[in-house]
Amino acid sequence: MTEVTELMRPEGEALNTKEVLLNLGPQHPSTHGVLRLVLQLDGEYVERIDPHIGYLHRGTEKLAESFTYTQIFPLTDRLDYLCPPSNNLAFALAVEKLLGIEAPIRAQYIRVMMAELARISGHLLITGALPMDLGAMTALLYAMREREMIMDLLEMITGARMHTSYCRVGGVREDLPDGFLPKIREFCEIFPNRIRDYERLIENNRVFLSRTQGIGVISAADAVDLGLSGPNLRASGVDWDIRRDEPYEIYDRLDFDVITREEGDCYARWLCRVDEMRESIRLIEQCMEQMPEGPFQVDIPTIAFPVDKERVHCSMEALIQHFDLSAYGFDVPAGEVYSVIEAPKGELGFYIISDGSPKPFRMKVRAPSFVNLQALFGVTNARYLADMIAVLGSLDPVMAEVDK
């Protein structure tokens, strides 16, 4: 047996070290999905990161070439499955741009309200999950309590809790149900105080602060060079938000602040998302105040399903309209378009090439999580194994959106 004294080295003499390869994932709670990182370690120091993605690849972009434009909406639900209304909206806007149409004003307000609910839902999860990754579990339990309220609201309006498929080309699937606005007003009254509860849980937690402040710093220049977007970009001091700078739908009618931080570290990214939830509440409240009466989808029989579903049972014209759109879809003029929105994770874009048929010739998704994930490999001051968990959580990738 080797004596303990034999393992000791004279002062100043270097120890012999051995590089170790460590698999982080693909089944690991802190990777937030099926991400595999092969880490080359020297002790606890990470010398190299080799990412392995694709475990959740379903061929979404190729599948879209075999689907009509209406049938593609369920595929978009499964990109960032935490925030499907935002995915639906981005795709609908791209197709509407090709068609040269706009959704009715009431439908635009409903879409924006749903997109902001989705933003809160997505931010809530990482608001609680990042502290949990670092050992503080209570915040996640609080966050899931409020997220359950949002799931109930989504179920009330769409009939589904996750894969909502609520948007349609030219509007939304159905109008707001009776009793929905009082429910969402109740949520808007409760939620700001709940956000303050999250901050009280975390802002004096010395362990969480030491694990996130000054860790994973991304400068403004690096954030731009890496192509980051969303809270990950704004936390580095870049004042850019598509909702304000390239407004779509009715965002130019709404008043809100773009949240930025200067530190660019893990804590700044967490704070950005917390503050953005407050702004989303402001936007939802303005939507409820300004929303006019009127149609919830365009009145174009060749594009939109019959508004009155009862007519399908007693009108031959409505039945034919419903059957044709369900079975064959609608032709979209030949051309190409790129449409982008400010999704919860960042800039979500759809590039579509149409050949004039009811199905896209090519569809490309610009997924923000795919771009944001690359920042993990560009961070220079977070090279310890424990820091990888904090940085990855603060970037908030969704692997379904990365792998598509």
UniProtKB/Swiss-Prot annotation:
Its EC number is 7.1.1.-. Keywords: Cell inner membrane, Cell membrane, Membrane, NAD, Plasmid, Quinone, Translocase, Transport, Ubiquinone. It is found in: Cell inner membrane. GO terms for cellular component: plasma membrane. It is a peripheral membrane protein. It catalyses: a quinone + NADH + 5 H(+)(in) = a quinol + NAD(+) + 4 H(+)(out). InterPro entries: NADH_Q_OxRdtase_suD, NDH1_su_D/H, NiFe-Hase_large. Gene3D superfamilies: Cytochrome-c3 Hydrogenase, chain B (1.10.645.10). The keyword Aminoacyl-tRNA synthetase does not apply. NDH-1 shuttles electrons from NADH, via FMN and iron-sulfur (Fe-S) centers, to quinones in the respiratory chain. The immediate electron acceptor for the enzyme in this species is believed to be ubiquinone. Couples the redox reaction to proton translocation (for every two electrons transferred, four hydrogen ions are translocated across the cytoplasmic membrane), and thus conserves the redox energy in a proton gradient. NDH-1 is composed of 14 different subunits. Subunits NuoB, C, D, E, F, and G constitute the peripheral sector of the complex. Belongs to the complex I 49 kDa subunit family. This is NADH-quinone oxidoreductase subunit D 2.
